[in-house]
Regions:
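Acidic, mature catalytic/reactive cores of soluble proteins
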Residues: 1-493
Length: 493
């Protein structure tokens, strides 16, 4: 808004991923609608377009706009020039075109414009690859894109099988998960952001724009339970291609914690000293240092998602099963190693209870699938190792004095004294997943007592501000490359 103070409200157009920002002033009301056009599944025509439509709802509104693109995170130069259709920004790293009917002026590497809208009028701005020219920016053309995109999202969401009391929240969550999918490959990224801090002004600003095996598996759980089997099938295809080229030799194992959407290795983590993240939070990072970590828990999350896909989706192929057996063979030889686990600590590997839990899940689910489908496997070895894992978790992961399962197995080195309860017993919220993965039952008397005590301890620890997540406060050493909690809602088997 060009003149005066404005009140802002932001929301999604109902049952869509069209973002609406409403600005209210004494002179009128204007809406800014941001969306990526999507008119049909696998819509190649609009894959790299971002549309911003400004609509005056009431009054007469003077507006200003500006665009300041930076190539290669501000490390590559570019030149801006005015064009008949708007402006173009070109350099060695690529070229962008801003198409609009609003007159623009170029100032250095940026472009600006002023315009006034009366009630019922609109202006559109379309940002896309300069090599593409996928349509005009007239009011009618952009209206067609808007209506088509709204229809697509509502049609997609109509496939949801959820009709409970939390419909609005569940559907908003699954719409977000859909935004994180890469349709050409089937990959599911963890988040579309970098430079978004855990705390405003803090240092923990990570690059999340990759496929974390763990997070993608959690997303798959949610999609399957809601009835979106096509997305689950596409991710399983991505995973199958990944396993086909996985190397099972070496201590690093056949799986990495994270990959690019193409299934390739993630770049080295680089600090962008010249840039700031959200609200001045610095430093910004590109790439992710967790790429070389050993995170044994991902085998459990991955195989559990395959188990659910086999149960609710199309079912896995024999070829995919043989790949999983190869994966499991490696895990059976390495499951008792220290690792960085779900919290991706950078202070050295530990014997994490959560990793043992998910290794148990991996073997237990393979046994289930083999029996249910009659698939071949070394069930004797699998079950013996599974039972060894179970005993270790119960005997070394439980602290009787603290009344809780602990983050690390005994004997272990716990330096985080201020985060400990009952001596060396550091509480880990990830272990609250135990009943969800069928390790313990909160209703069967033999195991419910431990579970209830552990849950109560976790609740007390969290409410007293001592973190239940992991080694966060002491010598942080960039302890975790992410802050997302496990998306565990809807875990039912």
């Amino acid at each position: 808004v060009a003149d005066g103070e404005a009140t802002y409200h932001q929301f999604y157009f109902p049952d869509t991923n069209v973002l609406v920002t409403r600005m209210l002033t004494e002179d009128g009301i204007v809406e800014v609608q941001d969306f990526m056009p999507l008119l049909r599944p696998k819509d190649e025509a609009h894959r790299q377009r971002l549309v911003r439509r400004v609509v005056c709802v009431r009054g007469r509104m003077p507006m200003r706009m500006g665009i300041a693109p930076r190539m290669d995170y501000g490390r590559a130069p570019h030149e801006a020039r005015a064009t008949a259709y708007g402006a173009e920004f070109a350099g060695p790293a690529g070229a962008l075109a801003l198409r609009t009917r609003v007159p623009l002026r170029v100032e250095g590497r940026d472009a600006h414009g002023e315009f006034t809208l009366s009630a019922g009028e609109s202006a559109a701005f379309v940002l896309e690859d300069a090599r593409e020219d996928t349509g005009g920016t007239s009011a009618a053309e952009v209206e067609e894109l808007f209506l088509g995109t709204v229809a697509y999202w509502r049609g997609w969401l109509s496939r949801s099988g959820y009709a409970g009391r939390w419909r609005e929240r569940v559907h908003r969550s699954v719409l977000t998960l859909k935004l994180l999918t890469h349709e050409p490959s089937g990959a599911v990224i963890a988040a579309p952001t970098l430079g978004l801090p855990e705390r405003v002004g803090g240092e923990r600003n990570w690059d999340y724009r990759y496929v974390w095996i763990r997070d993608a598996a959690f997303s798959l759980y949610a999609l399957l339970r809601l009835g979106f089997t096509e997305e689950a099938d596409a991710f399983t295809g991505w995973l199958t291609r990944l396993l086909r080229k996985a190397c099972v030799s070496g201590e690093g194992g056949p799986l990495r914690a994270l990959y690019t959407i193409d299934g390739e290795a993630v770049r080295e983590e680089v600090v962008l000293d010249h840039w700031e993240g959200y609200r001045g939070s610095a430093p910004c990072r590109v790439g992710n240092g967790a790429k070389d970590q050993l995170q044994l828990d991902i085998f459990g999350e991955l195989i559990d998602s395959v188990y659910l896909f086999n149960k609710y989706g199309k079912g896995i192929s024999y070829e995919a099963w043989t790949d999983l057996c190869t994966l499991l063979d490696w895990l059976l030889d390495h499951w008792d190693q220290p690792d960085e686990s779900i919290w991706e600590t950078r202070a050295g590997r530990q014997r994490h209870t959560y990793s043992r839990l998910m290794c148990w899940v991996a073997v237990e689910r393979m046994v289930r699938v083999a029996r249910q489908r009659g698939l071949p496997g070394d069930l004797g070895r699998w079950m013996a190792t599974r039972d060894t894992m179970y005993r270790q978790i119960i005997e070394e992961g439980w602290d009787e004095e603290a009344g809780t399962f602990t983050q690390r197995l005994r004997p272990g080195d716990c330096a985080e004294a201020e985060e400990a309860v009952g001596g060396d017993a550091v509480v880990d919220a990830a272990l609250l997943l135990m009943p969800m993965v069928k390790f313990l039952s909160p209703t069967i008397r033999a195991s419910s007592a431990r579970w209830k005590r552990s849950a109560a301890t976790s609740s007390r620890t969290a409410s007293s501000s001592a973190t239940t997540r992991g080694s966060r406060r002491t010598a942080w050493r960039a302890p975790r490359a992410r802050s997302r909690s496990a998306r565990s809602g809807g875990w039912r088997r």
